[in-house]
Structures are given as C-alpha cells and as structure tokens.
A protein has these predicted regions:
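Bacterial Sec-dependent N-terminal signal peptides
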Residues: 12-39
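Short beta-strand elements
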Residues: 158-169
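Short flexible loop/turn segments that cap and initiate beta-strands
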Residues: 63-117, 162
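Sec-dependent signal peptide recognition
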Residues: 3-10
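Short, exposed beta-strand-loop hairpins at the edges of beta-sheets
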Residues: 148-160
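Short glycine/proline/serine/threonine-rich loop/turn segments at secondary-structure transition edges
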Residues: 138-147
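Beta-strand-rich structural segments
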Residues: 32-37, 42-75, 79-84, 132-133
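Glycine-centered loop-to-beta-strand initiation motif
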Residues: 124-132
Length: 169
C-alpha cells in the first residue's frame, strides 16, 4: 500500500517536470538611429549645397543587446540614388531595393558604372556604434533619398532591417 502511495505521489511530479520547459531566450535587440538632420513636415531633410557637387552627411547607428553595446555588428547599406562619373546632367534611381535602376536627366553615354551615394558596409565598435556616409549630388535636389539598412548582430544570430527616407532640399 505504501509503495502504491509513493508511486501515486511521485508520478505526478515526474510528469509535471517533464512537461515544464523553460522559455527560449530571445535577445532584446535595439537599433538607435540618429540622422542628424532637421525634420521638416515629418521628414528628415538634407539641404544640398548647390555650390558643391557632392554633399556628404553622416548617419549614426547604435546597436544594443539586452541594453549592452553590441560590438562587431555588421551593417549593409544600399541607397536608391546613384551618379555617373563625368556626367553632371543625370543620375540613376531605383524605386525599390531589388528594382532596376533608371536614368533621370540628360544622360550622356559613358563607360562608367553608376556610383553609389552610400557606403556599402560598416561594423559597430566597442560602444555598439557606427556611422554611414551618404553623399547625394546637387542635381538630386527634390528627390527622396532612401537608405536601406540591414544589420546582423554578432553573438545573437539575429538580424534587423529598415529604411530611412530623407528629403533632399
């Protein structure tokens, strides 16, 4: 009788312990973006200097995992605008990340490939921070600059992606 009672008390504990699983850890990944631009009508706006061909501007990124800086997080960047070496009358544009580029303006045939207006890659430092240089040219005034970013967070085996729209004034 005592053995049956022990079995009766132990079996529920055994089944309960087999059924309880710990929840899977999901890191809290945060990406902070500082575009360092004035916001006009709800849109970050970069005023292009018409006395300069190329206008360089920096956008800052910070990656944290569970509130701590994420070192060596790998960023990829793409933009929707391109320019051509030796051609000041036209530029290239893409409507989406995977779309083909088309030309705007009086494009003279040249042998040069389109020049991107953004760096392609960057890594975060020990503070989880990095910068990306964007460099639209003066004839792009009036366009909306799209910066597509994608980050792979080292150690967390997870990534994040997003888009920043910037009005070129």
């Amino acid at each position: 009788m005592i053995q049956k009672l022990r079995l009766f008390l132990i079996l529920p504990l055994f089944f309960y312990s087999c059924g309880v699983t710990e929840s899977e850890y999901k890191p809290d990944i945060a990406i902070e973006i500082e575009h360092n631009l004035p916001v006009i009508d709800g849109v970050p706006t970069l005023t292009l200097n018409q006395n300069m061909w190329q206008n360089i501007h920096y956008i800052d990124f910070k990656v944290t995992v569970d509130g701590r800086p994420a070192q060596y997080s790998s960023f990829s960047f793409n933009s929707n605008l391109f320019w051509f070496i030796g051609d000041t009358n036209s530029y290239g544009k893409k409507n989406c990340l995977e779309c083909s580029m088309y030309t705007i303006g009086d494009h003279s045939e040249n042998i040069h490939d389109p020049v991107p207006t953004s760096n392609y890659r960057s890594l975060t430092d020990s503070d989880g921070e990095t910068r990306n240089a964007i460099a639209p040219v003066s004839i792009m005034k009036g366009e909306t600059y799209k910066l597509w970013w994608d980050v792979w967070v080292t150690g967390s085996m997870e990534g994040r992606e997003g888009t920043i729209d910037i009005k070129l004034n």
